[in-house]
């Protein structure tokens, strides 16, 4: 599949090839941090993101949170206990099994280690 936007394609390629060294990584990680803050605030009001029932809102954001987790960056919610609890409840759902089975876990072994190694620098980027 060809990505129609050449600029987006180049950003994606740079992120894959150079990771946190790309000039726009800081912007991307700050978007996640802001979203996680908003999720924490909402979870102070409701059990799930849109209500007290599991809804499409939870389904839609789960792959993004799961990706951050697999990249070894779960520290992003270490000070967000409601988000951590939400994600634990999502992972406990039978429907989450399909996400865990794809792609093969060895794909994330190196990226997870890199995320843990790079966390101090990433944390500084978020704070800046």
List the model feature ranges, each with a label:
Residues 1-88:
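GST-like fold's C-terminal all-alpha helical module
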Residues 84-128:
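Long, positively charged, glycine-interspersed low-complexity recognition regions
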């Amino acid at each position: 599949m060809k990505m129609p936007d050449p600029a987006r394609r180049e950003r994606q390629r740079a992120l894959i090839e150079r990771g946190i060294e790309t000039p726009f990584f800081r912007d991307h990680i700050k978007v996640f941090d802001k979203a996680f803050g908003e999720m924490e605030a909402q979870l102070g009001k409701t059990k799930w993101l849109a209500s007290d029932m599991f809804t499409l809102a939870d389904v839609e954001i789960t792959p993004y949170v799961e990706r951050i987790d697999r990249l070894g960056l779960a520290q992003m919610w270490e000070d967000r206990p409601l988000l951590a609890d939400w994600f634990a409840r999502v992972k406990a759902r039978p429907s989450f099994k399909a996400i865990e089975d794809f792609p093969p876990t060895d794909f994330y072994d190196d990226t997870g280690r890199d995320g843990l190694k790079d966390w101090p620098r990433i944390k500084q980027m978020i704070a800046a």
